[in-house]
Amino acid sequence: MNAVFVDTGGWMACADRSDPAHAACTAARDATLEAGRLLITTDFVVDETLTLIRFRLGLAAANTWWQQIDGSARLRWESVENDRFERARNLFVLYRDKDLSFTDCTSFAVMRELRLTTVITTDGHFRQVGFDVLPATRPRRTRTPRRS
C-alpha cells in the first residue's frame, strides 16, 4: 500500500508550533502528501491526539485540528475493532519488556495488517519494534520499562 501511518506524536508535533519536532514532522507529512501517498491513522490515535491537543493547546486548537482532518480525502481512518483489538492485546503482552501504551499496540497491529512500514511520529517505540520512522531524526527518549 502506498501509504504512511501517522501516530499521535506526529500529529501533536504538526499541531504544536512550539514542539521541537514541529518543522520536521510537518515537512515529513507534507512530503508524503506531495508524493501522492495516503496518510493512515486509527480511531484510537485520533482519540488520543484530540484529547492531548485539547489539554495542551486548548479547545480551539483541538477543534481546528479536527476540522483539518475530518473528511480529508488524503487521510484514511482505520477502526480498531474486535480482531485488531485482540491482536493489539497480544502485542501488548508480547512486548512486555517495552513501556508501550495500548494505543501504540493498536497502531502496530493495524500497520502490520496493512503492511505499512513507515510512520510519522516522535515515539521511539515504533523504531524499537521495527518500523521506519519519519522524520529520520533522533526519537524522543522513552521511559525505562518497569520490571514485572
Predicted regions and their residues:
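A general alpha-helix detector
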Residues: 10-11, 47-52, 87
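Alpha-helical structural signal
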Residues: 29, 46, 66, 104-107
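Active-site neighborhoods of divalent-metal-dependent phosphate/nucleic-acid chemistry enzymes
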Residues: 75-118
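Acidic, PIN/NYN-like endoribonuclease modules and their adjacent C-terminal/linker elements
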Residues: 108, 112-148
